[in-house]
Amino acid sequence: MNESFEFDVLEGVYEPAADTYLLLDAIIINPSDSVLDVGCGAGLASLVAASKAKRVVSIDISFLAVRNTTENLRKNGLVQNVSVLQSDLFTGLAHDAKFTMIMFNPPYLPADEMNTEMDHALIGGEEGSELTERFVKEASSHMVKNGRLYVVVSSLANTDAIINTFTENYFQVEQVNEEPLFFEKIQVLKGVFKGHKETVL
């Protein structure tokens, strides 16, 4: 990622980290793309997408993150082709909204005994994979055929379950980036949507 943006992170919002940059290094955005940034956080991925794509929708379950993304887009003069919404994954979108590219740097750590105010941005379920599995299932309803889905996963989570969810929902999946960290390995998975199987009556 070579772009530089004027950028602030509000307290209580996930700050861009190694996983954010790993995702941004893996994605390819075309000028004709309609992009959905799920879990937009402070909005760095939304800024990158807005500077390249035809249309961007940015969503986050956290109102604070929605505010943060909106402020950063305004600060960089990138509001004209972006909508920012508070939404729990796809629930706030029109049921027929379709995208050529969807990206998500999800909470991917398994649950532990420690509870913090940032758990919503870090914990992806008991095994760390449950939220990502739900995301992949729901994403298939919002993708055009051959649309690309990018998601960050951790070796600490149940990555086999995530890969199985991709294939069960008609995605052709591959690993496109990875980085070993101190206690885990993070990867970016890319799924290309092949369309729902036709039911023959």
Question: Where are the model-predicted features located?
Answer:
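Active-site-adjacent beta-strand anchor residues
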Residues: I59, G125, V151-V152
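Mobile active-site "lid"/loop adjacent to the S-adenosyl-L-methionine
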Residues: P106-L131
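Class I SAM-dependent transferase core
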Residues: M1-I29
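A short helix-to-beta-strand connector/capping loop
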Residues: E3-F5, G77-V82, F171
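Short amphipathic alpha-helical segments
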Residues: T70-E71, M114-E117, I162-N164
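Flexible, glycine-/basic-rich loop-and-beta segments that form/coincide
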Residues: G195-L201
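Conserved Class I SAM-dependent methyltransferase catalytic core
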Residues: V13, E130-V188
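Conserved SAM/SAH cofactor-binding pocket of Class I
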Residues: A18-D96, M101-D112
